[in-house]
């Protein structure tokens, strides 16, 4: 496939040059953001999460945003150690309010995953390390998601310095609980849909990554996730296998038998009716996979093994993105420590999830899962008690990769990177994507900044300087092309 497509380029070089000129200041801004350990899962660090929100408010004020609000979400629900623990606020702000312009809402999160140097970091996780030889910025939150969040601020600063008018109205929505379940966000979006977000025409999220390390992508789909547990309970207490082994029905044996009927060794889901709900692959979609820059070797490198179930790129990507999968996650209540323990567990809970795709209906999937597991347990004729439950579910999301948003983002990407981006889907879930689409009734674009090897949630999280600075150019260029669409 050609590395370029023909389109009318906008005169954006002055903007790109200004972003390059401001590079030292932009790196300093990210350094300040990383220095605030805004770990949402650590109650003792909640003041730091709030400090990060206030940092963003100060930045927005300096840049000329208006109608800046800190939306308080109330007390955090259990389980918590502090019953009065307050949820971090959601930061809202506007830049421009011209009724003749389109309005773009950008979402990001300012909280991060926990990180300690003792975890294996080469440097202090909350002190940004700038490796000038490799041109890499290391630090917790560098790519997930403080880099993209301050990237939007950088775009505004570059326009201000140039004296350029922003081609759209911009609304920002930055939350502080994304890494801990986005508590309160869905309710706020629903509440503000006809208030603060009333005139929004489009939502852009930069909270995902390139598929690999060399080619930018635009993401138009995410799988959903239905998470289940199977509870099997027998004896009144854990028992000694030397005394009771062979003479009672063991819950663990029942559970293993039932869980073995869910998926086979090739990854095929064995629950009847699941694949009947999957939307057929169209020729147009199938062609999108041809040009995507990916290989079996990259999968092996990412997994640290040679255990792929598929031997070619297209099959790997289809099974990661557009076919459902079932994964067994663990067994609660069973012995899992080192050494040998001859206990018969009295109660075990098996955990598994199904990644969902179009056109799987969540409720119908639940019914199929419950029917299958109930049927398989009945075949055992076991005297043990049995129950299957849905723990949580989140729907899949798929957009039109040929709409105005994606077309504008593709042009901006080509301007900056001189290559047509890959159009990708992802195997994971970003639930807020669906919430914005449903509540606001507008298109959502996933426009990633970081690479596939950035190590979000891992040790030595990083963001390449080229991705950070070119990412800012891409975000800015996108606003111009979308404003003209």
Curated annotation (Swiss-Prot):
Active site residues according to the UniProt entry: 111, 178
GO biological process: proteolysis
Pfam families: M20_dimer, Peptidase_M20
Enzyme Commission (EC) number: 3.4.13.-
Chain sites annotated for binding Zn(2+) 1: 144, 179, 457
Record GO terms (molecular function): metal ion binding; metallodipeptidase activity; peptidase activity
Keywords on record: Cytoplasm, Dipeptidase, Hydrolase, Manganese, Metal-binding, Metalloprotease, Phosphoprotein, Protease, Zinc
Single GO cellular component term: cytoplasm
Ranges in coiled-coil conformation: none
Compartmental location: Cytoplasm
Domain of life: Eukaryota
Positions that bind Zn(2+) 2: 109, 144, 207
Cofactor(s) named in the record: Zn(2+); Mn(2+)
SUPFAM superfamilies assigned: Zn-dependent exopeptidases
Family: Belongs to the peptidase M20A family.
Function, as annotated: Catalytic component of the GSH degradosomal complex involved in the degradation of glutathione (GSH) and other peptides containing a gamma-glu-X bond. Also functions as a dipeptidase with high specificity for Cys-Gly and no activity toward tri- or tetrapeptides.
Quaternary structure and interacting proteins, as annotated: Homodimer. Component of the GSH degradosomal complex.
PANTHER family assigned to the protein according to its UniProt record, in alphabetical order: BETA-ALA-HIS DIPEPTIDASE (PTHR43270), CARNOSINE DIPEPTIDASE 2, ISOFORM A (PTHR43270:SF4)
Protein name per Swiss-Prot or TrEMBL: Cys-Gly metallodipeptidase DUG1
Taxonomic source organism: Candida albicans (strain SC5314 / ATCC MYA-2876)
Taxonomic placement: Eukaryota, Fungi, Dikarya, Ascomycota, Saccharomycotina
